[in-house]
Amino acid sequence: EATGVHTKFYRFPGGSSTQNTSLSIQNFIDVLKKNHYLYLDWNVISPDINNANATKEQVVTGVMQGVDAYDTAVVLMYDVADKPMTVKALPSIIKQIKAKNYELLPVDESMILIQHNNGNQEEGK
């Protein structure tokens, strides 16, 4: 309401396969479905998420290896102060994606939803 934009998508903190809750994730998924929300996860993780010392080159290489492995890749990246390499790596990642004639698409209802909880990691190439 505050932004005037209505979203239809939800990303679970930690993903739909998270073990960080004592409640069943399926209960949350059922509520989302009942309210016509779609949830999505990721199948590629930027290396700097788990390694604060990752270099720009490591981030680019790690992300591109993941992107190359899937027909549909959803990349988890954080734009936060303690992950500065994400922002620094993005121009190189985008350039490489375009050079390979891959598409950069927004999240929308037509995409293949990557969902950890139902086992959909999307088939590799």
Where are these regions (language model features)?
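Catalytic domains of cell-wall/extracellular-matrix polysaccharide-remodeling enzymes
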Residues: E1-K98, Y102-E103, D108-I112, H116-N120
